[in-house]
Amino acid sequence: LRLHDRNFSVRYETNIPRQVGLAGSSSIIVATLRCLKKFYGIDIPLAQQPSFVLSAETEELGISAGLQDRVIQCYEGMVYMDFDRLVERVADGLTFYAYERLDPDLLPPIYLAYHDELSEPTETFHNDIRSRYDGGESLVVNAMQHFGQLTVQGREALLSRDWGRLSALIDENFDTRRSIYKLPSWQINMVETARRCGASAKFAGSGGAIVGVYRSEAMFREICDRMAAIGSHTIKPVVTG
């Protein structure tokens, strides 16, 4: 691959809250990759881009992470991700999987809440689980397999617009995660606060942001009020294709 020898500099700004599991660091790398592609006039197949970004984070920055955040940032919108080894492919030294775009109009009303002051870096959240998984701990291995099953069921619930089922799966996701992680009390409090309003709740990623389904504007207002009382900010994310 031949690149021209013109110089460049990179400057960036972001409004993504830091260290609350909303993938702010990888979003900067994805944006930088897009700039470099345009600057050098090169193309990287879309399915390979998340793996390229992840390799920069793991190999150059030493960050423990997975492909999920990078996939949705590269594809945008809503994407079903299948990480089964049966669909694993390798091209140009990059391992990637099966990613399916879904229509964002299938989504029910969702909220996103994050803590305004407390946070935890993604690598802190993931490092212990990675070593336990690699060591073959059955509790962790079984939980990871269950997460995959929940994803398949979540896709089916979206396609059939079964929002009650989707809400139940969201709650089951968090309950499964709680069974293998030692979570800070303030993160548990965020989830339990949303659930007391009648909404579903799970982590949006790692480190202090949650996402879930709400049923009415009155419920959303209650979520906002109760989240504010524990130092958290709530928004309605806009998901476009």
Where are these regions (language model features)?
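FAD-binding core of FAD-dependent oxidoreductases
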Residues: 19-30, 64-79, 206-207
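Anion-binding (especially nucleotide phosphate/pyrophosphate-binding) glycine-rich loop
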Residues: 1-52, 56, 191
